[in-house]
């Protein structure tokens, strides 16, 4: 047990976690030179294309120290984007320590602070690692001062390295052994194994990633979930190096994978505790905090006959991503689909891309919304909704509340003025301003609907990419909100409804219908596009008709003949307008995503 180390690698996005993981694997011989590739743990095509880690990945490697002792290192490479903070906290719960990787050029950023505080809350040993020291503009001394002042942790054991060149990797491995404590499990106790991840394999069924806290597990063992009756037989098990290596047993404090013939993806959840059927433990390990989505959107299959395939695909994605929420939804405009909950807009884009790539399902995605709280006049009853179509009539509402996010923005001092203007524009209220040498922390309370609406992109734009953001939900606050309905050819399109602050409603309504006008093709009749609040039209534009020249074959002749042809055309257009179907391109449903 004293020769095992379990740790996560945490950092802000793009600070070099995955490259550092590659170098640790290479140094310890997890893969040969021929098998090595950049970001070897980023297994999804999406991860490689975007250059980000989406799913946490675990690896077991062996290291022989300078003193000649062999150590087993189990580590998890985690995502750095704020949308995937849940993956980080889940990974930390399976470890005794964390490598806090910091870019020695960019320095401490928002997710550096947030991830470090998560590790501190879990009482993990933290080893700060300054990466990219090979770059000419690296500032290790300044970053060390920022670590002490901004994060508030000691830099006594700090490790300096370059994950790209491999400089300092041996010294880092030695510090991992010294700083991160060995686990305290007991191999003689009953089996207790925490399920830290799961995914579906079309040949093997459900695959579980577990961390064994006590006891051991071997092939043909009968196992069960504590608190449930179902019994499973272990068929295969092993570890990742990162290659999938089969073993006959997994021992106390090892991290590995298990296949036990589970075909029903609802049978087991991430965070549950596995034990043996005989000599079983009754004590559950600490359960993960249930994650609640921050935003919701409607997802509808482009082809109605793909509904069942779509449902099965969501089931399988949810097994691998427990933060994904979905429930059936029926739209008058788009038919049957699902209302899905996500951790943020990036998470939403990733799920959409995975559905299209991995399951070949084309989908229409409606604009994202947040959860609202309404207090009704009758009995002062509280209701919650995340779909604009569920917005109650104004005469029934006593008050409406919107979710508020606490935003921690870390920025170089020269961008403070522009960032404050952005926060005010987004209806933010300043709560604190903390100066640190050349950096400042701005703390604002901003409506969550404003945060998900291009706030991050605008923050990056006005700060030339140097400002960083961390945010979390803190509660609901009363606000003056209205629902904008969009009517196309006098028909309300429920999937285009939008909730916003009353002061912004005119401006937003005009922007939406102007964008829709540019996308919908012209028809052989006028197509009005209207925006309404309750039953009051607040803005309107028209798509002008296409006109066929019915007089082209009428050369000369009686003028009354021409009038008859024009009159006939007019009647035909009138009839077409009543019964005609407006073709609404898919891009229309994305317009509200981009109105800001």
From Swiss-Prot:
Signal sequence coordinates: none
EC number: 3.6.5.n1
Keywords: Cell membrane, GTP-binding, Hydrolase, Membrane, Nucleotide-binding, Protein biosynthesis
Membrane topology: Peripheral membrane protein
Residues that, per the record, bind GTP: 14-19, 131-134
Reaction catalyzed: GTP + H2O = GDP + phosphate + H(+)
Residue ranges of domain tr-type G in the record: 2-184
Single GO biological process annotation from the record: positive regulation of translation
PROSITE patterns linked: G_TR_1 (PS00301), G_TR_2 (PS51722)
Listed InterPro entries: EF-4, EFG_III/V, EFG_V-like, EFTu-like_2, G_TR_CS, LepA_C_sf, LepA_CTD, LepA_IV
Family membership noted in the UniProt record: Belongs to the TRAFAC class translation factor GTPase superfamily. Classic translation factor GTPase family. LepA subfamily.
Family matches, as PANTHER family: TRANSLATION FACTOR GUF1 HOMOLOG, CHLOROPLASTIC, TRANSLATION FACTOR GUF1-RELATED
Function, as annotated: Required for accurate and efficient protein synthesis under certain stress conditions. May act as a fidelity factor of the translation reaction, by catalyzing a one-codon backward translocation of tRNAs on improperly translocated ribosomes. Back-translocation proceeds from a post-translocation (POST) complex to a pre-translocation (PRE) complex, thus giving elongation factor G a second chance to translocate the tRNAs correctly. Binds to ribosomes in a GTP-dependent manner.
HAMAP family (alphabetical): LepA
Protein name stated in the entry: Elongation factor 4
The species this protein was found in: Buchnera aphidicola subsp. Cinara cedri (strain Cc)
Classification lineage: Bacteria, Pseudomonadati, Pseudomonadota, Gammaproteobacteria, Enterobacterales
């Amino acid at each position: 047990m004293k020769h095992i180390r379990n740790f996560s690698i945490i950092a802000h996005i793009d600070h070099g976690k995955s490259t550092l993981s590659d170098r640790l694997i290479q140094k310890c011989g997890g893969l040969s030179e021929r098998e090595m590739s950049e970001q070897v743990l980023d297994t999804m095509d999406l991860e490689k294309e975007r250059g980000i880690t989406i799913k946490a990945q675990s690896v077991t490697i062996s290291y022989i120290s300078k003193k000649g002792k062999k150590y087993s290192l189990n580590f998890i490479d985690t995502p750095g984007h704020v949308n995937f903070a849940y993956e980080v906290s889940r990974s930390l719960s399976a470890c005794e320590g964390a490598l806090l990787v910091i870019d020695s050029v960019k320095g401490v950023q928002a997710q550096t602070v947030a991830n470090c505080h998560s590790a501190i809350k879990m009482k993990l040993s933290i080893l700060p690692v300054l990466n990219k020291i090979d770059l000419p503009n690296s500032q290790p001394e300044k970053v060390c001062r920022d670590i002490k002042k901004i994060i508030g942790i000691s830099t006594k054991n700090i490790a300096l390295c370059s994950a790209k060149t491999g400089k300092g990797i041996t010294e880092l491995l030695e510090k991992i052994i010294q700083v991160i404590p060995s686990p305290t499990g007991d191999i003689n106790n009953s089996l207790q194994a925490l399920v830290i991840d799961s995914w579906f394999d079309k040949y093997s069924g459900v695959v579980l990633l577990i961390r064994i806290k006590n006891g051991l597990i071997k092939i043909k063992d009968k196992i069960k979930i504590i608190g449930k009756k179902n019994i499973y037989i272990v068929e295969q098990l092993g570890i990742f190096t990162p290659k999938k290596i089969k073993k006959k047993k997994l021992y106390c404090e090892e991290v590995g994978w298990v296949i036990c013939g589970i075909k029903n993806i609802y049978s087991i959840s991430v965070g549950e505790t596995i034990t043996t059927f005989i000599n079983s433990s009754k004590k559950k390990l600490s359960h993960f905090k249930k994650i609640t989505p921050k935003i919701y959107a409607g997802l509808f299959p482009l082809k109605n006959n793909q509904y069942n395939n779509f449902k099965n695909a969501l089931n399988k994605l949810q097994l691998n991503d427990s933060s994904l929420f979905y429930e059936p939804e029926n739209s008058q405009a788009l038919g049957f689909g699902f209302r899905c909950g996500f951790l943020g807009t990036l998470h939403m884009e990733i799920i959409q891309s995975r559905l299209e790539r991995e399951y070949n399902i084309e989908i229409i995605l409606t604009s994202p919304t947040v959860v609202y709280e309404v207090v009704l006049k009758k009995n002062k009853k509280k209701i919650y909704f995340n779909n604009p179509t569920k917005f109650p009539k104004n005469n029934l509402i006593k008050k409406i509340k919107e979710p508020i996010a606490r935003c921690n923005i870390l920025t170089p001092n020269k961008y403070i003025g522009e960032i404050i203007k952005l926060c005010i524009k987004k209806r933010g209220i300043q709560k604190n301003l903390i100066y640190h040498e050349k950096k400042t922390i701005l703390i604002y309370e901003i409506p969550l609907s404003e945060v998900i609406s291009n706030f991050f992109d605008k923050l990056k734009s006005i700060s030339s990419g140097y400002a960083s953001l961390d945010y979390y939900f803190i509660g609901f606050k009363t606000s003056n909100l209205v629902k904008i309905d969009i009517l196309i050819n006098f028909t309300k399109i429920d999937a285009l409804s939008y909730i916003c602050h009353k002061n912004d409603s005119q401006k937003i309504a005009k922007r939406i219908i102007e964008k829709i006008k540019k996308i919908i093709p012209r028809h052989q009749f006028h197509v009005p596009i209207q925006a309404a609040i309750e039953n009051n039209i607040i803005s309107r534009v028209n798509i002008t008709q296409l006109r066929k020249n019915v007089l082209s074959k009428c050369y000369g002749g009686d003028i009354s003949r021409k009038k008859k042809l024009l009159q006939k055309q007019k009647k035909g257009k009138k009839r077409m307008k009543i019964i005609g179907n407006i073709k609404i391109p898919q891009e229309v449903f994305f317009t509200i995503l981009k109105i800001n």
